[in-house]
Amino acid sequence: MSAPHSALQAELDAAQSPYLAFRGIGKSFPGVLALDDISFTCQAGQIHALMGENGAGKSTLLKILSGNYTPTQGEIHIKGKAVNFTNTTDALDAGVAIIYQELHLVPEMTVAENIYLGQLPTKMGMVDRKLLRYESRIQLSHLGLDIDPDTPLKYLSIGQWQMVEIAKALARNAKIIAFDEPTSSLSAREIEQLFRVIRELRAEGRVILYVSHRMEEIFALSDAITVFKDGRYVRTFDDMTQVNNASLVQAMVGRNLGDIYGYQPREIGSERLTLQAVKAIGVASPISLTVHQGEIVGLFGLVGAGRSELLKGLFGDTKLTSGKLLLDGQPLTIRSPIDAISAGIMLCPEDRKADGIIPVHSVQDNINISARRKTLTAGCLINNRWEADNALLRIQSLNIKTPGPQQLIMNLSGGNQQKAILGRWLSEDMKVILLDEPTRGIDVGAKHEIYNVIYQLAKQGIAVLFASSDLPEVLGLADRIVVMREGAISGELDHEYATEEQALSLAMLRTPNIATNTASAVA
């Protein structure tokens, strides 16, 4: 075969092969096999989702693709040729860019400087500001953004930061762009803009890898889905008409969707927490409801319904402006979180990273931070033995996945951080647990574990009041669903009869119509 013909054949073969291929990728750390023989392919002009529980190996694979990690075994092929990335520069030069959840930008620098960071245009040994602005405007225009390139990044929104990160990738002519949980901090409008840009990048023939726990995003965007479990490849769905929530969950966790909530009936006791015409800051109307011992009550509503504000008021984070609280039939006054904790009322907040954990402290410290006030020695010294034993007990009983009690909690997954917060309150004399978006940002498998913990608390007679914007979660978990709209209760549904249609109808009613029964709640 002649040399020109061989070259032509090689070019044709490359054109017909997948743009990106993972061939037997493995990655080991001391004592841990993070990835085991991962093989799948991605096509140009395709949005390819990666799904799996936390710890399934998605992020590790992206770090190998970006040059942050070197695989223990296997190869990555781009356009039919094996590549070997020993650092991130190698990957960038090969046209690979990763848009991480924690954006890698410099707030004090301008938009233009961030876009061309590491490759600023120069003229006579100086940064060519005119060319920098010109080139930056081209990249921003490509994304449909009207932003002054000279604006310091710190003055932009998180959504705009993300667009700058994408512009930075395009400035390096990235043909493979991976997004790792990109919508976690975005508003609905910013998410819509991001999706528009991602679809445009697909139309340009780029390979898009997309990692998210949010199934609605996966189904809205993806052309194919590859599922990982415990560091291993499970399967690829390349026909989106043949996949649904149930089949995807089954592939991810090995359980049917109905098993995730695993509703557990139990004995409901007497009234534990009673709200009589209670108003809180951000809650427009007086709220009256009761949660019994061993009962799980879910608060559902659309954005602005007042669910989080009510829970914050009950915990003393914000002020209750009127009404009465009863705990086990006795009047209760709550002016601060200390009052609530002393009464046995605990809160797992909506934003666990900002309000629930102390990121730079250990798992042990985060579990013991509340109980510490009761366990100090006579000399006001920390009782290290008790704290170590208590932390180990909570880690084992809640199956918190951590290398050890001294691991920084910021290094744990969202599900394990949430379990550590629950472990903190198990050290208290808990009567009521308030949970605000208890499984937001948590993978399906960890959700199942959180639900089991909630059921166990309820079986111990603890009253559970939780707020969630995940309607299937509310319907699957709660004994009763209290629906709120614009700071008022618009209806109430019983677990046995509640449907998504009823709950959404109540959430969108224009006039509050308090209903106390089952299917008759919505006329």
UniProtKB/Swiss-Prot annotation:
The protein's annotated catalytic reaction(s) are: L-arabinose(out) + ATP + H2O = L-arabinose(in) + ADP + phosphate + H(+)
The EC code for this enzyme is 7.5.2.12
Instruction: Name the principal localization, coarsely classed.
Output: membrane
Instruction: Show the GO cellular component annotation of the record.
Output: plasma membrane
Give the matching InterPro entries.
AAA+_ATPase, ABC_carbohydrate_import_ATPase, ABC_transporter-like_ATP-bd, ABC_transporter-like_CS, P-loop_NTPase
Assembly and partners? The complex is composed of two ATP-binding proteins (AraG), two transmembrane proteins (AraH) and a solute-binding protein (AraF).
Q: Where does the record say this protein resides?
A: Cell inner membrane
* Protein name as catalogued: Arabinose import ATP-binding protein AraG
What's the stated role of this polypeptide?
Part of the ABC transporter complex AraFGH involved in arabinose import. Responsible for energy coupling to the transport system.
> Which residues hold ATP?
G52, E53, N54, G55, A56, G57, K58, S59
